[in-house]
Amino acid sequence: MFVEMSVCDSPNKNSKLDKKSLTPFKKVRRKNWKQEAAYKSDTSKGQEVSYVGERFIPNRFERENIEFNLKYIGKRKERDILETGVTLTASYWRQSGFISNINRTFGIGERRLFQFSSQQGTRSRVVDNDSADSDWPCNPRARPYAIQNATHEMPGICSPVDYNMMDWSSGGMVAMSSGQDVMLWRNLDESTMVFSVESPTSLKYSPDGKHLAIGCMDRNYPVLDLWEVRSPTEFLVSYRKLFFKSMGYISCIEWSHDGKEVICGTQCGVIIVLAMPTLNTLMQLREHRHTVKKMKFAPTHKYFASSDTDGKIFIFDAVLKVRLLKLDGRSIVFDWHPWTGEDLAVAERSPASIFIFNIPRRQFVASYRRRDDRIVIKTLTYSKITGELLVNVIRRDDADLAVCEILVLASLNRVVDLMSHQDRGTLFLMWNPDGTKIATGGLDDTFSLWNFFPTYKREAILRKQEQKAKDKCSSLSLYKGIR
């Protein structure tokens, strides 16, 4: 499935393949450079060394390779994004801040400070500096906002991390389970409520936060319980669905965007679509042959993706539930881009590999691939506000100790932030509903909350979007009135 590509490279970044990546000029040697070099060689013998007035003749390169030399075309060699750490991250923020301040001070709209051509008859326009060098649509933050603001003790939270056993509802309720009971609390700042559930295997809140679906066991039979959230402290089991014993257990749960369907992935690989609120079976999808590990709808409601423990990903039509394509890999994790709904970020845990797959084109548009097992990818997820890709990695340091950190990528060759803790490490758990906060776990059984994006900036973005929608509606109304 995956095409062999060089590390830290994407198809549109290879200067030897993409002629547009070359500079608009061509270096040409002087015609008599050989005579100058020979004269310099002859006259230098037997003379005293002088440091005044001497002419420096640089080393020569083969003419056919001169255009592809990184030194001449002005491109820095791409570095390994999973091993850069604080060094590259700090340099990015310094460079980004310097460029933005210079442009703001002098009113520069173009990326280059100097333009050696006539500007008469042309209008200056602001150009997206990163559009030509991005592997997906992204608007990275102006500076690193991600800081820890709360830490709680929670034994067993990272042994191991199961993303199907935790969720954060739109109503602010957090549900988690370590396989024994289900713990519920509101906004991480109130007392925890513990409910006794027999062998919970998965859980998921509805989009409106009014229902909580819990997969559990009743003796040897898999069961789906539907809890109605009546208040922050009151829950009612409104419906229960009993499955055949051959299904094994409910491994993961997903809701449709309108909350009218509940999709259950099972141990045997069957995906069951249920209707709300009676939980009647609408259809069964039998593409997988192994335990279904993750299911997720695209944000545009057009596609539905599912993956299993064997590394296979199936893409379905979100409405008809018809299989569109299949991807093969090894121990795969994935996430949809929050804006396009067509770009699927796919990662293989080891050797660490990241691929950006475009569904309509049915091809990989960018890739990163390691050739060793030193780094393992735990999971990856997009920020729905900025479009940045968060990659949770586990690696060994010089003392052979496990280091867990979250790399924030604006592209497959650009690290823009690093979320880490020197002592306990950082394991990604989940986003809060509006995408401004991140919950993480530590190797010392701690639960931490990070501010990823300022709330006031998020509110400003929402107000701007609402204003644009109102302006668009008013323009359409005016157009209809004219007609």
Curated annotation (Swiss-Prot):
It is found in: Cytoplasm. Female meiosis-specific activator of the anaphase promoting complex/cyclosome (APC/C). Required for the completion of meiosis in oocytes. Activates the ubiquitin ligase activity and substrate specificity of APC/C and triggers the sequential degradation of mitotic cyclins in meiosis. Promotes the ubiquitination and degradation of CycA early in meiosis I and the degradation of CycB and CycB3 after egg activation. Promotes degradation of mtrm at the oocyte-to-embryo transition. Coiled coil: none annotated. Interacts with anaphase promoting complex/cyclosome (APC/C) subunits Cdc16 and Cdc27. Interacts with mtrm. InterPro entries: Cdc20/Fizzy, WD40/YVTN_repeat-like_dom_sf, WD40_repeat_dom_sf, WD40_rpt. Belongs to the WD repeat CORT family. WD repeats lie at residues 158-195, 196-237, 245-284, 287-326, 421-460. One of its GO terms (cellular component) is cytoplasm. This is Protein cortex. The keyword DNA-binding does not apply. SMART domains: WD40. It comes from the Eukaryota. The lineage of its organism: Eukaryota, Metazoa, Ecdysozoa, Arthropoda, Hexapoda. Pfam families: WD40 (PF00400). Probably ubiquitinated: degraded following egg activation by the anaphase promoting complex/cyclosome (APC/C). One of its GO terms (molecular function) is ubiquitin ligase activator activity. One of its GO terms (biological process) is pole cell formation. PROSITE patterns: WD_REPEATS_2, WD_REPEATS_REGION. Induction: Transcription is activated by grauzone (grau), which binds to its promoter region. SUPFAM superfamilies: WD40 repeat-like. Highly expressed in ovaries. Expressed in nurse cells from stage 6 to stage 12 egg chambers. As oocyte matures, it is transferred from the nurse cells to the oocyte. Its main location: cytoplasm. Keywords: Cytoplasm, Developmental protein, Differentiation, Meiosis, Oogenesis, Repeat, Ubl conjugation, WD repeat.
